[in-house]
From Swiss-Prot:
<dbReference type="InterPro" id="IPR043129">
    <property type="entry name" value="ATPase_NBD"/>
</dbReference>
<dbReference type="GO" id="GO:0005975">
    <property type="term" value="P:carbohydrate metabolic process"/>
</dbReference>
<dbReference type="InterPro" id="IPR018485">
    <property type="entry name" value="FGGY_C"/>
</dbReference>
<dbReference type="Pfam" id="PF02782">
    <property type="entry name" value="FGGY_C"/>
</dbReference>
<dbReference type="InterPro" id="IPR000577">
    <property type="entry name" value="Carb_kinase_FGGY"/>
</dbReference>
<keyword id="KW-0418">Kinase</keyword>
<comment type="function">
    <text>Catalyzes the phosphorylation of autoinducer-2 (AI-2) to phospho-AI-2, which subsequently inactivates the transcriptional regulator LsrR and leads to the transcription of the lsr operon. Phosphorylates the ring-open form of (S)-4,5-dihydroxypentane-2,3-dione (DPD), which is the precursor to all AI-2 signaling molecules, at the C5 position.</text>
</comment>
<protein>
    <recommendedName>
        <fullName>Autoinducer-2 kinase</fullName>
        <ecNumber>2.7.1.189</ecNumber>
    </recommendedName>
</protein>
<keyword id="KW-0808">Transferase</keyword>
<keyword id="KW-0963">Cytoplasm</keyword>
<dbReference type="GO" id="GO:0009372">
    <property type="term" value="P:quorum sensing"/>
</dbReference>
<comment type="similarity">
    <text>Belongs to the FGGY kinase family.</text>
</comment>
<dbReference type="Pfam" id="PF00370">
    <property type="entry name" value="FGGY_N"/>
</dbReference>
<dbReference type="GO" id="GO:0071518">
    <property type="term" value="F:autoinducer-2 kinase activity"/>
</dbReference>
<dbReference type="InterPro" id="IPR018484">
    <property type="entry name" value="FGGY_N"/>
</dbReference>
<dbReference type="InterPro" id="IPR050406">
    <property type="entry name" value="FGGY_Carb_Kinase"/>
</dbReference>
<dbReference type="InterPro" id="IPR033676">
    <property type="entry name" value="AI-2_kinase"/>
</dbReference>
């Protein structure tokens, strides 16, 4: 929970509901983009007994948590519900919700649900093994994270739910439905189902028909920032918002995060550093990667798409390193009243660029068509404790995250022709001053860090404001509200050093993948169906 103003505010405010993978938040902003207060709660996704890889989304409990967060945010802000002019919701992508024909939610899964591995393989075999390419050419998605394998799994193993289903939405749309009673999806989030056309920004029912699935469960498509409905009396009683408050279409977390960062024009590039790292490039028109390495998603800006690559578990790897090896540093940081990562960065800053040649093996570059990673490890360690220690390994991890990001951006530039002239760096990773400088050095372009680094909720609030006429347009408002903390200029000497390190790392990583292929080591993660 956070609160930035201890007096009783007055005026107009916007609320963003942000449903992440591990937590949910209700965040209140004023019209200048200042965060006033937030209520937050963690939530868990439930494995189903005897269903490997399953992660169901608990509709009943999670709605209660959302209501708790809304009431908490209003309380912390010392605001009456009448001060909230509009509300919008954003969420993790790929997670889906099914409703019966009366509009009641009956089943949902989180984005991390991986139960449909067999169904992914089954669908790949369609059309002489060409179905996945057809899906990608239309939607920019492969089958690994799409909705179709999950729907096919339900048809196989839960035909009762499959037969009852009348409508499908994303998790952000479920929140909007719980508030307003209305059902619709937006292109930015629904695009990750693999069933939405990148050009028309509407459903492609023929993809479901080709897969032998029902095409009568597709809800209306409304653009982000358009009015969906109003808070019902029932929802108002449950969550504390005022009945009649406008509910506006939100969207996918990454795309709304880009809106909150002002990344709204073709050619702009962002690296979003969280548990996963996303490298996102706005493309001037819909285009796909002929090698199927990169996913293409609809932006929340109408008519625009984004090339998106993903580095796996980057933030999680740093947390693992901190918790597994840095107990002393955690205690010292606590005594000094600083963040442990800040202390580790201070230590790592004294290590020369290149980290004495240590090569972390964690996430690979993105290969969307055949998506798997090598076993986690460190390569090229030294027995010299002056050169190989916690500070060296921490710096090596930061350098490696930047190298993987640079590789992913290079892949995007290769097929799209869009090469980054600067990078916006946001998310938790952007709090690291050393990490920001390393990213600039590795990519060779200036890196801009915003004041508001967790921008998804701000982007969602902008959508709410546009939907009720408080803001003129999504793109103009995103540009106007973003404020910059610092710009990092690349060190050209380090750039050459990191280019050589990148070449070496790519060769070593290829060999490490071979060990996974031989069954000698265990992949960090592999997509369903591989």
């Amino acid at each position: 929970m956070s609160q930035l103003d201890t007096t009783t505010p007055s005026g107009d405010y916007l609320m963003a509901l942000d449903a992440g993978t591990g937590s949910v938040r209700a965040v209140i902003f004023d019209l200048n983009g200042n965060q006033i207060a937030a209520g937050q709660a963690e939530w868990l996704h439930l494995p189903v007994p005897d269903v490997p890889g399953s992660m169901e989304f608990d509709l009943t409990t999670n709605w209660q948590l959302m209501c708790q967060c809304i009431r908490q945010a209003l309380h912390l802000a010392k605001l009456p519900a009448s001060a909230i002019r509009a509300v919008a919701a954003c969420s993790m992508r790929e997670g889906i919700v099914l409703y019966d024909r009366s509009g009641t939610p009956i089943w949902a899964c989180a984005n991390v649900d991986a139960r449909a591995s067999r169904e992914v393989s089954e669908l790949k075999e369609l059309h002489n093994n060409g179905f996945e390419l057809e899906v990608y050419q239309c939607s920019g998605q492969t089958l690994a994270l799409s909705a179709m394998p999950r729907l096919l799994w339900l048809a196989h193993y839960r035909p009762d739910i499959y037969r009852q289903a009348g409508t499908l939405t994303m998790i952000s749309d479920w929140l909007a439905n719980m508030l307003s009673g209305e059902l619709a999806v937006d292109p930015s989030n629904a695009g990750t189902t693999g069933m939405l056309d990148l050009v028309t920004r509407n459903w492609q029912p023929n993809l479901l028909e080709m897969a032998g699935l029902r095409a009568d469960i597709l809800s209306p498509v409304k653009e982000t920032g358009t009015l969906l409905g109003h808070v019902t009396a029932k929802a108002a009683q449950e969550c504390g918002l005022l009945a009649g408050t406008p509910v506006v279409m939100g969207g996918g977390d990454v795309q709304l995060g880009c809106l909150g960062l002002g990344v709204v024009h073709a050619g702009q590039t962002a690296v979003l550093g969280g548990t996963f790292w996303q490298q996102v490039v706005n493309l001037p028109q819909p285009i796909i990667d002929p090698n199927m390495n990169t996913r293409i998603n609809p932006h929340v800006i109408p008519g625009m798409v984004q090339a998106e690559s993903i580095s796996f578990f980057t933030g999680l790897t740093m947390r693992w390193f901190r918790d597994a090896f840095c107990a002393e540093e955690k205690l010292l940081a606590q005594r000094l009243g600083i963040d442990t990562y800040s202390l580790l960065e201070d230590m790592a800053a004294r290590v020369p660029a290149g980290a004495y040649g240590v090569m972390p093996i964690f996430s690979d570059v993105m290969r969307f068509k055949s998506w798997y990673h090598a076993a986690p490890s460190f390569i090229n360690l030294s027995l010299d404790p002056e050169k190989c220690n916690k500070a060296t390994l921490f710096r090596a991890l930061e350098e490696n995250a930047a190298i993987v990001s640079a590789c992913n951006l290079a892949q995007i530039a290769e097929f799209s022709g869009v090469k980054a002239s600067s990078v916006v760096f946001a998310g938790g990773g952007a709090k690291g001053k050393l990490w920001s400088q390393i990213l600039a050095d590795v990519t060779g372009v200036p890196v801009k860090v915003p004041v508001v680094k967790e921008a998804t909720a701000l982007g969602c609030a902008i959508a709410a404001g546009v939907g009720v006429g408080l803001y003129e347009a999504l793109d103009k408002t995103g540009e106007r509200l973003v404020r910059w903390e610092r710009e990092y200029i690349p060190n050209t000497e380090h750039k050459a050093l990191y280019q050589a390190a990148k070449t070496n790392w790519q060769a070593v990583y290829t060999d490490q993948l071979g060990l996974v292929d031989c069954g000698l080591t265990t992949s960090l993660w592999k997509a369903p169906g591989l």
